[in-house]
Amino acid sequence: ILMQGRAAGKKFVGCHSLEELVANLSAPRKVMMLVKAGPAVDTIIDSLLELLDAGDIIIDGGNTHFTDTERRTKYVEEKGLLYIGTGVSGGEEGALKGPSMMPGGSELAWPLVEPIFKAISAKVGPNDDIPCCEWVGPRGAGHYVKMVHNGIEYGDMQLICEAYHMLKEAGGLDNDQL
């Protein structure tokens, strides 16, 4: 329901299988996964490797640990393909309006996806024309930056919770005052 009506007037091609997806892409093909980190990523990579050709790009936009991205980058490159581990931040609003993106991995892949990533990323600046996306480095760098980002974000949330608790308990303020 969240996406209902949002594709009106846009060019989308629905696919029912990885085979159909790959067949609908132009070379060099770029396939972005947004799945839960862990074994599912390896399963999808192995399935894609059977369908893609040398020079095609696999992109992991999940919250993967950077050491897994380093391993996967090496594995995919050994098969002749390129791999990008991309930190993606912004939640539901980012999904709809553009996320902050932190790509890293196979450096040869960046020029091939840069225009796409910068087009779909959030924009900042006085004219909202500066993309929230820049290449952050090789191997697991993108997911490393996302890990640091999450650490800062969770630290900020904890600080807000503790300040709220102190103001409520020690300061005697109620929820409406806070």
What does each model-found stretch correspond to?
Residues 5-7, 52, 56, 121-127:
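Alpha-helix termini
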Residues 4, 24-27, 47, 119, ...:
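Residues within well-ordered alpha-helical secondary structure of globular protein domains
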Residues 1-20:
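NAD(P)-binding Rossmann-fold cofactor-contacting core
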Residues 14-84:
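Rossmann-fold NAD(P) dinucleotide-binding segment
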Residues 1-2, 32, 93:
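Tryptophan-centric aromatic hotspots in well-structured domains and transmembrane helices
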Residues 3-7, 29, 98-101:
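Short low-complexity, flexible loop/linker segments enriched in glycine and/or proline
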Residues 41-44, 60, 65-176:
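Rossmann-fold dinucleotide-binding core
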Residues 18, 175-178:
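Alpha-helix initiation and N-capping motif
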